[in-house]
UniProtKB/Swiss-Prot annotation:
Classification via InterPro entries: AAA+_ATPase (IPR003593), ATPase_AAA_core (IPR003959), Chaperonin_ClpB (IPR017730), Clp_ATPase_C (IPR019489), Clp_N_dom_sf (IPR036628), Clp_R_dom (IPR004176), ClpA/B (IPR001270), ClpA/B_CS1 (IPR018368)
Subcellular location: Cytoplasm
Organism: Geobacter sulfurreducens (strain ATCC 51573 / DSM 12127 / PCA)
Family label: Belongs to the ClpA/ClpB family.
Protein name: Chaperone protein ClpB
Chain positions covered by the region annotation NBD1: 161-342
Pfam families in alphabetical order: AAA (PF00004), AAA_2 (PF07724), AAA_lid_9 (PF17871), Clp_N (PF02861), ClpB_D2-small (PF10431)
UniProt keyword annotations, A-Z: ATP-binding, Chaperone, Coiled coil, Cytoplasm, Nucleotide-binding, Repeat, Stress response
Region (Repeat 1): 7-72
Domain called Clp R: residue spans: 4-148
Assembly mode: Homohexamer. The oligomerization is ATP-dependent.
């Protein structure tokens, strides 16, 4: 009998499983048949793969073994534990002898399988032989799987066929045509080939920003190896990608991870240069598997890399390379850096054109060239925190996905007709209950006619939609077949089967292409009656996706929006009174940006609003936010009175490394990162510390700002508004009497308050005039309108007489303080007495409240009309 400590974990599990099966079936002894069933149903076991390798069918063998178990005698009412039968003891002894013969330290499941053949009279052994499993072919399969390895620990299965378990064969995937085509990147691939062909330190590491195509370069290399487009030294090599997740997952005990990694290194070394190992996210090696006193993965790889036994390609980002690899000089020197830069917009367009067919076939739609150009150019300009070509590919993918969902959904025209039918059916049922009424009968007849008409229309539309959908689906499946045939032709050509290659290329492919053309022509004929389903991704759809991602309106303007922008000043004047010059300057900047004529490397507009308090500087920013975003609170508002100290600059852009709050980011930079298209208002800018202006210089000039964490924040889609009271004394003193002198005095005051390099970067310095009495009357109307809206929620109507309006204008007018005293006057004279009257119950819902001037002309009277 084998001692338990001399069994592998899988052997112990198999025997325990056999014991449980015997107990469940009510058998008095544990037989070889129980053990065979237990071995076949083991997860991650070696027996099922061995049987498959020798040509047997594990599922059929399992069924046969189940039948044998059911035939075993059952004992009812027995409580004693089942014992090992003599037949099973003989198999276990034979397994021990097999382990000794193979010089293995532990009895493994494969030894148990060989043990079955020692007792040919055993029913389980006969079942194995009937399934085509013999001792000789099991030994041959075992040699192939184990590769001459001995069982030296209790978990040997983890180390068998390590590459098959813990790596993906990229060359095999390339042969099957499962990798996306790699366009361009010839310089980087050539550089990788040069490093791989070196005698020593032939391990390139691809370094670049996330999304620039590092993994794609390795996939391109795999495709080149398959097509033979590589130097002689690299021909017929296997490129396998190590799966770190699979390597670490399930390694419960100390040393298991190291065993697995050693097995991978051994298998690569044994291939004598035939296998090139690709480790994506190379930095994950540093610290992987390190526990108390254990080595991490990178230290285990170093000796093999240094000796040249391990051919390896790494890939990692710049930040992670600096953070993990550069700190370990011994690991860094074993790799040769290959820098991978971000491709240009032109290169990205070429890459997208190469990938176009793959995405068309997957989504079953067509992608226009205008969509590809839009994806590359718009993602480059508006999605600044990611890199080409990844962000452009994502745009195309999402646009295609959205179109596919539209094709699969019911068109709006049919949906509207169906809803109308349901509505009329409900109405019909209601009228049927009142069938005695002659008017109801007449209405019923009309309803029946309308329903019949609508149902006929619905059936016609559905038929048209279904025909379109069927043809689009058929064309999609034909395109997929075409791609499969092209891959088959490439495979046949590689294998030297030229007859099959010619048959596919000159027979099958042209036939499929002809059918695609016929179906497309049929679709065009159907669409002459009317197009119901979109089928092409165009530039406009891509622009819409960009708008959804960023909140920046880059899609083509609808007629309504264009008209809105043309009359932008008229809309703003309804909120900001008496400052026409300021509104025209702001409107021009927005129009330039939306028509695509503004400088792409600067903010949409940067303005310095000057003027006395209460004349509408901050209100202009709010009115602009309401115009652009339909929400006057959609402003990144920074009150500069909070930034009077030098150290408060850190609050704007984020604390530097080592300081508290480093992870949180800055108030300005974080707000703009989240909403790249916004209005940034720096209120009362003259109150800020001079250091703050130095931070704003690069925002105003280059439309960018680097935050405390080194990230570049894009300000090119923001409107920057700064307000200040500097020079307001001159504006009030000279006002409209001497505009030229007033402007000269204000400019002098500005030069004293701000540095010339700051003033020189501002697009427009806008001077707000003090408000005359006539303008205050207009503001009364605006303020009272707000009050009317609040009362309308309570269904109370407010009316204001002309005399009351004149009175409020006079009382609320103060040239020194602008419109703010007016707000306080309305609060004091109307809101306070009205609030008291409402609480006393003098006014109810549905009442009309009239505000008039008293006979004395000294106060307002509020009465019910």
């Amino acid at each position: 009998m084998i001692r338990p400590e001399k069994m592998t974990i899988k052997t112990q599990e198999a025997l325990a499983g056999a014991q449980q099966l015997a107990a469940r079936q009510g058998n008095g002894s544990i037989e070889p048949e129980h053990l065979l069933v237990s071995l076949l149903e083991q997860e991650g076991g070696l027996i099922a793969p061995i049987i498959q390798k020798v040509g047997g069918a594990p599922a059929a063998l399992r069924s046969a073994a189940d039948v044998l178990v059911k035939r075993l005698p059952q004992v009812s009412g027995a409580t004693a534990q089942a014992y090992l039968s003599p037949a099973l003891n003989r198999i276990l002894d034979a397994a021990q002898r097999e382990a000794d013969t193979m010089k293995d330290e532990f009895v493994s499941t494969e030894h148990l399988l060989l043990g079955f053949f020692a007792d040919r009279q055993c029913a389980a052994a006969r079942a194995l032989l009937d399934a085509g499993v013999s001792r000789d072919n099991v030994l041959a399969a075992l040699m192939e799987i184990r590769g001459g390895e001995r069982v030296t620990d209790q978990n040997p299965e983890d180390t068998y066929q390590a590459l098959a378990k813990y790596a993906r064969d990229l060359t095999d995937l390339a042969r099957q045509g499962k990798l996306d085509p790699v366009i361009g990147r010839d310089d980087e691939i050539r550089r990788v080939l040069q490093v791989l062909s070196r005698r020593t330190k032939n391990n390139p590491v691809l370094i670049g920003e996330p999304g620039v195509g590092k993994t794609a370069i390795v996939e391109g290399l795999a495709q080149r190896i398959v097509s033979g487009d590589v130097p002689e030294t690299l021909k017929d090599k296997r490129l396998v990608a190590l799966d770190m997740g699979a390597l670490i997952a399930g390694a419960k005990y100390r040393g298991e991870f190291e065993e697995r990694l050693k097995a991978v290194i051994r298998e690569v070394a044994k291939s004598e240069g035939k296998v090139i190992l690709f480790i994506d996210e190379l930095h994950t090696l540093v610290g992987a598997g390190a526990a108390e006193g254990a080595m991490d993965a990178s230290n285990m790889l170093k000796p093999a890399l240094a000796r040249g036994e391990l051919h390896c390609i790494g890939a990692t980002t710049l930040n992670e390379y600096r953070k993990y690899i550069e700190k370990d000089a011994a690991l860094e020197r074993r790799f040769q850096q290959v820098y991978t830069g971000e491709p240009s917009v032109e290169d990205t367009i070429a890459i997208l054109r190469g990938l176009k067919e793959k995405y068309e076939n997957y989504h079953g739609i067509r992608i226009k060239d205008s969509a590809i150009i839009a994806a590359a150019t718009l993602s480059d300009r508006y999605i600044t925190d990611r890199f080409l070509p990844d962000k452009a590919i994502d745009l195309i993918d999402e646009a295609a996905s959205r179109l596919r969902i539209e094709i699969d959904s019911m068109p709006t025209e049919i949906d509207e007709v169906e809803r109308r039918i349901i509505q009329l059916e409900i109405e019909k049922q209601a009228l049927l209950r009142e069938s005695q009424d002659p008017h109801s009968l007449e209405r019923l007849k009309k309803l029946a006619d309308e329903l019949e008409e609508l149902k006929a229309k619905s059936a016609e539309l559905k038929g048209h939609w279904q025909r379109e959908k069927d043809i689009i689906g058929r064309v999609s499946s034909l395109r997929q077949r075409l791609e499969e045939k092209r891959e088959e032709a490439k495979k046949a050509e590689r294998e030297g089967n030229l007859a099959r290659t010619a048959e596919i290329r000159y027979g099958e492919i042209p036939a499929i292409e002809k059918e695609i053309a016929d179906r497309s022509a049929e679709l065009e004929d159907i669409r002459k009656e009317g197009k119901m389903l979109p089928e092409e991704v165009d530039g406009e759809l891509v622009a819409e996706i960009v708008s959804r991602w960023t909140g920046i309106p880059v899609s083509r303007m609808m007629e309504g929006e264009a008209d809105k922008l043309v009359h932008m000043e008229d809309r703003l004047i309804t909120r900001v009174v008496g400052q026409d010059e300021a509104l025209v300057l702001v409107a021009n900047a927005i129009r330039r940006a939306r028509s695509g004529l503004s400088d792409p490397n600067r903010p949409i507009g940067s303005f310095l609003f000057l003027g006395p308090t209460g004349v509408g500087k901050t209100e202009t920013a709010k009115a602009l936010a309401e115009f652009l975003f339909n929400d006057d609170q959609a402003i990144v508002r920074i009150d500069m009175s909070e930034y009077q100290e030098k150290h408060t600059v850190a609050r704007l852009i984020g604390a530097p490394p080592g300081y508290v709050g480093y992870e949180e980011g800055g108030q300005l930079t974080e707000a703009v990162r989240r909403r790249p298209y916004s209005i940034v208002l720096f209120d009362e800018i003259e109150k800020a510390h001079p250091e703050v202006f130095n931070v704003l210089l690069q925002v105003l000039d280059d439309g960018r700002l680097t935050d405390g964490q080194g990230r570049t924040v894009d300000f090119r889609n923001t409107v920057i508004i700064m307000t200040s009271n500097l020079g307001s004394q001159w504006i009030q003193q000279y006002g409209s009497s001497d505009y030229a002198r007033m402007k000269a005095m204000v400019t002098e005051t500005l030069k004293e308050g701000f540095k010339p390099e700051f003033l020189n970067r501002i697009d427009e310095i806008v001077i707000y005039h003090a408000l005359p009495l006539e303008q205050i009357k207009k503001i009364v109307d605006i303020q009272v309108e707000c009050l009317k809206q609040r009362l309308a929620d309570r269904r109370i109507v407010l009316e204001l007489s002309d005399k009351a309006r004149e009175y409020l204008s006079r009382e609320g007018y103060d040239p020194a303080y602008g419109a703010r005293p007016l707000k306080r006057t309305i609060q004091r004279k109307i809101q306070d007495p009205l609030a008291l009257a409402l609480l006393e119950g003098k006014f109810q819902e549905g009442d009309t409240v009239r505000v008039d001037l008293s006979v004395s002309g000294e106060e307002l009277v509020i009465t019910k009309k």
